[in-house]
C-alpha cells in the first residue's frame, strides 16, 4: 500500500506541476478542463490541480458490468474480483499450414476469436490481432468489430481509429442487439482509446476519437 500511495502521489504531483502538452490544437475536452480549474503554463502545458483529480476519482464508478452478446456471459467488474481477457494487437502470426510467420489477416482474427470463445478462463475478448489485409481505417474497424461479434458472445474490446468508425461500429452493434439505442443500454463492447503520447502529451486526433466514443456510450477501459 505504501508503494502504491507513492506512485499515486507522484502522478498527482506531475499532473499539477509538469502537466500535459498537446500535439495539435486543444481538443474540446482539454478546453473544458481549462474552464473547470486547469490552467495553461508558460510553455502551454495543461496543469491539472490535485484537488480536481481527487474529486473526479472520488466520483468514479467502482463497479460496472461488461455486457456480453449472450447476457449469461456478462461479467461484473468490482473490487475483490479478478477477470482475465485478451489484449494487444499482433501483426504477425505463425501459419499453421506453412509453419512460417506472415502478416495477420481478417480470417485469423475470426479464428482466434472463435478459439477464445471456447476458453473458460478468458472472460472477455479484446481484439487480439490486427487484420493487416485491410488498409482503410473505417473499413478495418467495421470488419474487426464484425469478426469479434461473429466469433464470440463474450464481452468484446475494440480500438477505433476515427470518429466515423465510432458511429459506424455502434450502429452495427445496435443492429446486433435488436435496434437503435440498444447498444447504449447494454454495451456489448468496451474500447481502449489511448490519448496520451510520450512524453506527457495529449494527441488531438486521439482525444477527439475518445470523446466521440464517450458520447456514443462506449465504455472505456
Describe the predicted segments one by one:
Residues 103-221:
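Helix-rich catalytic cores of soluble enzyme domains
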Residues 1-107:
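Acidic/polar, glycine-rich intrinsically disordered N-terminal extensions of enzymes
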Amino acid at each position: 500500500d505504501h508503494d502504491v500511495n507513492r506512485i499515486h502521489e507522484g502522478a498527482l504531483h506531475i499532473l499539477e506541476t509538469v502537466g500535459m502538452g498537446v500535439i495539435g490544437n486543444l481538443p474540446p475536452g482539454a478546453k473544458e478542463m481549462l474552464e473547470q480549474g486547469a490552467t495553461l503554463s508558460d510553455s502551454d502545458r495543461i496543469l491539472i490541480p490535485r484537488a480536481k483529480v481527487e474529486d473526479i476519482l472520488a466520483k468514479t464508478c467502482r463497479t460496472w458490468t461488461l455486457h456480453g452478446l449472450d447476457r449469461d456471459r456478462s461479467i461484473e467488474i468490482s473490487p475483490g474480483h479478478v477477470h482475465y481477457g485478451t489484449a494487444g494487437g499482433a501483426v504477425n502470426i505463425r501459419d499453421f499450414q506453412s509453419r512460417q510467420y506472415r502478416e495477420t489477416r481478417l480470417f485469423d482474427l475470426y479464428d482466434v476469436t472463435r478459439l477464445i470463445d471456447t476458453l473458460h478462463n478468458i472472460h472477455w475478448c479484446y481484439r487480439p490481432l490486427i487484420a493487416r489485409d485491410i488498409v482503410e481505417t473505417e473499413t478495418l474497424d467495421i470488419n474487426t468489430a464484425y469478426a469479434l461479434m461473429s466469433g464470440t458472445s463474450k464481452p468484446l474490446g475494440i480500438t477505433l481509429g476515427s470518429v466515423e468508425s465510432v458511429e459506424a461500429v455502434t450502429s452495427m452493434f445496435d443492429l446486433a442487439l435488436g435496434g437503435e439505442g440498444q447498444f447504449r443500454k447494454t454495451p456489448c463492447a468496451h474500447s481502449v482509446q489511448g490519448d496520451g503520447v510520450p512524453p506527457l502529451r495529449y494527441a488531438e486526433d486521439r482525444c477527439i476519437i475518445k470523446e466521440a466514443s464517450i458520447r456514443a456510450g462506449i465504455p472505456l477501459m
